[in-house]
Amino acid sequence: QEGGLHNCIYFIIPGIIAFGVLQYAMPELKRVNNEYVKKNAAKENSGAGMSISYISIFFMLLYIFLRSTVHSSVHTYLPIYFMKFRGFDTVTASTLVSIFLLNGVLGTDCGARLSDKLGPRKIIVGSILLSSLPIGFVPHATAPWAAMLAVSLAGFFIISSFATTVVVVQTMMPNNVGMASGLTIGFSIGMAGFGVTTLGYLADTYGLPIVLKSICILPILAAFIASRIPMPKEIK
C-alpha cells in the first residue's frame, strides 16, 4: 500500500536529522546568545534601546495576523476546492498543498537575504502585495499545471517576509526579544486559526469559491498597513 496514515511514521526521520543538526550547532548558538546577553546588558546600563512603540508593534502583529490567515486559509481550503469544484484527484490536490508549503520555505530564505540588501519595508510590503496576484488566480485555475504554477508563486511570496517581520519586532522590543518572538511566531500566527475559522464560516454561508476568490483582498490590506508602519532606525 503506497498511501495512508501509516506512512506518518517516516516523519520521524527528518525529526532525527533536525535533532542532530541542532546538537551540532548548539555550541555556536550558545556563543551567539551569550554575546547578545552581554550586549543587551550594556544597553540597559547605558539606558539605550529602551524605547518601545506599542502602536508600531500592534500594526506589525496585525500584518502578521493577516498574512498568516491568508497562508493558513489557502493550504487548508486548497485541496477541498480543487477536489470538489475542479475534479482533481486526492493525490493532485494534496500535491498542490506540498508545492505551496515548499515554495514558502524557499520564499522565506530568499526574502531574508533580500531584506538585508533592500531593507525590511520593501520586502514586507512588496512580498505580500505580489502574493495577491497568484492567490487571486488560484481559484480560477482549471488545469493542474496552472494550479501548480499559481500555488508555487503564492506560496513563495506570501510567507517570504516571515523572518523579516520577526527581526523587525525584535528590534522594536530590544529588551524583550523573547516576548517579541512569542508575539510574532506564537500569538499572531496562532490567531490565524481564528481567521481561518471565520473564513470557513463565510465559505459555508456564501460558498468556498467566493471566499477563495475574495481572499486576495487581505494581502492588499496587509501591504497598506505595513507601508504606514515606522521602521526602527537600526534596520532602515
Region spans (language model):
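Helix-to-loop junctions at the C-terminal end of transmembrane segments
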Residues: 107-119, 203-204
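Extracytoplasmic gate region of multi-pass secondary transporters
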Residues: 53-108
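Structural signature of the two symmetry-related core transmembrane helices
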Residues: 122-137, 216
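Helix-loop-helix hairpin linking two adjacent transmembrane segments in secondary transporters
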Residues: 1-31
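Intracellular juxtamembrane helix-capping segments at the cytosolic ends
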Residues: 160-173
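Juxtamembrane intracellular "pre-TM" segments in multi-pass secondary transporters
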Residues: 26-60
